[in-house]
């Protein structure tokens, strides 16, 4: 990822985080983890409160190991997300934003299956760069956006909070 796509990715992440930080419910309930995937997938930012989040400077490297990243994400969700039960309220289902500028270099099917079997609410695939092909992203999810044209309203359409009161 170089040039316009990396700028698009950085801008898109900042717009998304800005949307979250402006919303009081999000500030109180949202946690974010960032997984990068170049030559290898790694957790660049462990699960952190959105209000405490410091986004690292992303540096492009290697090919797009998206399948490996999806497998890592599925494992992280399994370990970190508390499922609702009779004894515990549990966490909100995660909303996953996948940001990429190209086709994966590895097989995404296993990781995608693991992710969809888990407790994910929504997967949004974000194309970083106007030349990014949308076809590989559409194979991941029906929710596909282009970061170069996305604004805060685009992200907000996927971020919903319900004020629930106990009467």
Give a label for each model feature:
Residues 7, 102-140:
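VWA/integrin I-like adhesion module and closely mimicked acidic/polar interface patches used
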Residues 1-45, 51-92, 95-99, 122-136, 143-167:
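Von Willebrand factor
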Residues 21, 44, 81-88, 119-120, ...:
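Cysteine endopeptidase catalytic domains of the caspase/legumain-like
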Residues 44-52, 140:
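Short, flexible, mixed-charge acidic loops at enzyme active sites
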Residues 13-21, 73-82, 112:
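Short, well-ordered amphipathic alpha-helices
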């Amino acid at each position: 990822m170089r040039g316009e796509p990396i700028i698009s990715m950085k801008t898109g992440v900042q717009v998304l985080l800005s949307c979250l930080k402006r919303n009081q419910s999000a500030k109180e309930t949202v946690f974010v983890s960032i997984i990068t995937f170049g030559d290898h997938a790694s957790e660049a930012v462990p699960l952190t409160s959105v209000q405490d989040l410091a986004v690292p400077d992303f540096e492009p490297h290697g090919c797009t190991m998206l399948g490996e990243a999806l497998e890592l994400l599925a494992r992280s969700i399994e370990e970190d997300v508390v499922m609702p039960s009779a004894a515990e309220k549990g966490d909100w289902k995660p909303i996953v934003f996948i940001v990429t500028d190209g086709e994966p270099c590895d097989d995404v099917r296993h990781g995608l299956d693991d992710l969809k079997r888990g407790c994910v609410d929504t997967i949004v695939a974000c194309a970083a760069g106007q030349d990014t092909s949308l076809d590989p992203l559409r194979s991941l999810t029906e929710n596909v956006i282009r970061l170069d044209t996305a604004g805060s309203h685009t992200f907000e359409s996927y971020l919903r909070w319900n004020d629930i009161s106990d009467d």
